[in-house]
A protein has these predicted regions:
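Glycine/Thr-rich phosphate-binding loops that ligate phosphate moieties of nucleotide
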Residues: 1-30, 35-36, 66, 70-96, ...
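N-terminal phosphate-binding loop and adjacent alpha-helix
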Residues: 26-61, 96-99
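Short amphipathic alpha-helical face segments that pack within enzyme cores
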Residues: 46-50, 105, 109, 208-210, ...
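Glycine-rich phosphate-binding loop of actin/hexokinase-like ATP-binding domains
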Residues: 76-97, 125-130, 134-156, 197-271
Length: 367
């Protein structure tokens, strides 16, 4: 049995076929092209179809898809009709108190920019949830863990008059691992898949990557890179630091400490290493102050996973072992973990990650 894993990027779709024993059957990335980003979400389904055709041509056996699992960037906002406000588009909004929410400022911006579409749209989604809606006709919002509620919204803040009827347009929360719906017949025919395949949502790509690197227990650490880079350290105490972003883990009672290097892809290798080194030292200091053991091994994901020469240089510089997993795109493995957990193949997300996340190569610092 395999899960069809889909991670929605800003300009491309990553698609993986991953088995219940963690085998990466196939991975493909394909750009979606549109003259404007305003309806870019409408390209996702056609891009997925194109990728599935390519994957089927490359395999000699049936895909045997038992579930579909979706993750993606955010907070991207999409209307029921596919009008899209990407996460990286910044607009000034009216002075509305949105607390610590990552989504409400974007939702307000959508309302102000696209007033007519806002009025006629039954729902407003984040990107992955819109794709779930497209596949199943079910409207949901994935809440990674109950403590994330302030990063989304709650009834109290939505009752403020400034938000008008926004509450009516936001689909209900579902838990990670909860079935979001089933593939409807028309979409199944279009994609040439079986009808009623269960569909799951792993939510934000950040969450999917933490699951897909198994950064789900105290002392685990991962380095996720793309246009920017982040070191993520799992701890069992809520810690605040001026240079660290603290967020809940998807595992209750655990927390994730993130040290971010914005636009790291534009930096030279040496400057990148210095920035990451600074982050590692800060996290080590935090670990020492809180009687936590700092790990000797760090899991990497993203584009850097393919650059063994740079990773060896990073291992030497940080004096840490670097683990490269059998899938360079951890989000896809995270998607698979969510689906197989939802299908009751595992008792917890952590059990799923323990089984599906596989180290392929370990680089050790040279003396």
């Amino acid at each position: 049995m395999n899960v069809l894993c889909v991670d929605i990027g800003t300009t491309s779709l990553k698609v993986g076929i991953i088995s219940e024993n963690g085998e990466v059957v196939s991975v493909l990335k394909k750009d979606f092209i549109n003259k404007t980003s305003k309806f870019i979400a409408e390209k996702w389904l056609f891009t997925l179809k194109s990728v599935l055709v390519q994957i089927e041509k490359s395999l000699t056996h049936n895909l045997d898809i038992c579930a579909i699992s979706i993750s993606g960037n955010g907070p991207t906002i999409v209307s029921s009709g596919g009008l899209t406000l990407l996460w990286n588009k910044n607009y000034k909004i009216q002075n509305v108190q949105t607390g610590n929410s990552l989504f409400l400022p974007k939702l307000i911006a959508f309302k102000e920019l696209f007033e007519k579409e806002y009025s006629r749209s039954k729902y407003l989604f984040s990107g992955p949830e819109y794709f779930v809606y497209k596949l199943t006709e079910n409207a949901i919002t994935l809440l990674p863990e109950n403590r994330y509620i302030n990063a989304y919204w709650n009834d109290k803040i939505l009752s403020e008059k400034e938000f008008g009827n926004l509450k009516e347009k936001l689909p209900p929360f579902v838990e990670i691992g909860q079935k979001c719906g089933e593939l409807n017949s028309d979409i199944a025919k279009f994609l040439k898949l079986k009808e009623k395949i269960p569909v799951f949502c792993a939510g934000p790509d950040f969450i999917a990557a933490l699951i897909g690197t198994n950064t789900l227990e105290v002392g685990k650490i991962c380095d996720r890179s793309g246009s920017s880079e982040g070191i993520n350290f799992c701890v069992n105490v809520q810690i605040f630091h001026s240079k660290i972003r603290t967020l809940p883990s998807v595992v209750p009672n655990l927390w994730n400490l993130s040290y971010l290097v914005p636009k790291s892809s534009k930096l030279s290798e040496n400057v990148r290493l210095e920035k990451i080194g600074e982050g590692i030292e800060i996290l080590k200091e935090i670990a020492n102050k809180n009687n936590l053991i700092f790990p000797k091994r760090i899991h990497v994901t993203g584009g850097q996973s393919k650059d063994l020469e740079f990773l060896q240089k990073k291992s030497d510089f940080l004096n840490l072992e670097i683990a490269i997993c059998n899938c360079n795109d951890a989000e896809l493995v995270g998607d698979a973990c969510v689906a197989f957990y939802g299908l009751k193949k595992f008792n917890s997300l952590k059990d799923a990650a323990n089984s599906l996340v596989k180290e392929d190569l370990i680089l050790k610092p040279k003396k």
